[in-house]
Amino acid sequence: MAKAVTIKIKLVSTADTGFYYVSKKNSRTMTDKMVKRKYDPVARKHVEFKEAKIK
């Protein structure tokens, strides 16, 4: 069986609220860490979310 191309990642809030999103990414085309600006409902504003591994 072949190795999966897409992997699940956790996008953790940089506002240190502990809130995170789960997303998928193509590990072959996106080799660098993903950073997205999304809404954090705990902080109630848009902040950057950085990629972390799912444990």
Curated annotation (Swiss-Prot):
Gene3D superfamilies in the cross-refs:
Ribosomal protein L33
Identify one Pfam family in the record: Ribosomal_L33
Q: Does Ribosomal protein appear among the keywords?
A: yes
Q: Name one GO cellular component term.
A: cytosolic large ribosomal subunit
Source domain of life is: Bacteria
Which PROSITE patterns has this protein been placed in? RIBOSOMAL_L33 (PS00582)
Per the record, the coiled-coil ranges are: none
InterPro entries the record matches: Ribosomal_bL33 (IPR001705), Ribosomal_bL33_CS (IPR018264), Ribosomal_bL33_sf (IPR038584), Ribosomal_zn-bd (IPR011332)
Q: Name one GO biological process term.
A: translation
Any idea which UniProt keywords this protein has?
Ribonucleoprotein, Ribosomal protein
Give the stretches traversing the membrane.
none
* Keyword Ribosomal protein found: yes
NCBIfam families on file: PRK00595.1, rpmG_bact
Q: Which PANTHER family match?
A: 54S RIBOSOMAL PROTEIN L39, MITOCHONDRIAL, LARGE RIBOSOMAL SUBUNIT PROTEIN BL33M
Query: What HAMAP family has UniProt attached to this entry?
Result: Ribosomal_bL33
Q: Which family does it belong to?
A: Belongs to the bacterial ribosomal protein bL33 family.
Protein name, UniProt field: Large ribosomal subunit protein bL33
The organism named in the record is Rhodopseudomonas palustris (strain BisA53)
User: Gene of origin?
Assistant: rpmG
